[in-house]
Regions:
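N-terminal ligand-binding/catalytic initiation module
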Residues: 1-123
């Protein structure tokens, strides 16, 4: 089971001021209440760095079942990938990602081979 979204955000605060990601914090608060993605399986392949964890916290707060994909076609911080594993968020190599997922959040076509039930988002 993934770590609570609250814990993920708390671990960001020593590195980033809340003023640096106000939209994601607002989204986090709104989605924590409404849970619009409850049970939705999402895979996300975008550059993975510590600040990306704010997006992951919002998706988890919304009820998403999140998997993060890393790929050589885009940069990622290996320490952050390890941290995600410690949070209980599955991290997979994009080229080995299966599916289907409800929503595929892709970047640079890293997940173009992964089937989606509802659609794709190119970031």
């Amino acid at each position: 089971m993934p770590a609570s979204p609250e814990r993920i955000l708390e671990n960001l605060f020593p590195f980033y001021r809340q003023e640096e990601f106000p939209v994601l914090l607002h989204q986090y608060k709104m989605w924590s209440e409404s849970r619009p993605l409850e049970g939705c399986r999402i895979i996300d392949a975008s550059p993975v760095f510590r600040n990306t964890c704010a997006k992951y916290a919002s998706l988890l707060a919304a009820g998403a079942e999140l998997t993060v994909a890393v790929s050589p076609v885009m940069p990622y911080d290996s320490e952050t990938a390890v941290l995600l594993g410690q949070y209980g968020i599955p991290v997979v190599e994009a080229e080995r990602a299966g599916g289907p997922y409800d929503v595929v959040m892709d970047c640079a076509g890293a997940l173009s081979h992964v089937p989606s039930r509802y659609g794709y988002v190119e970031l």
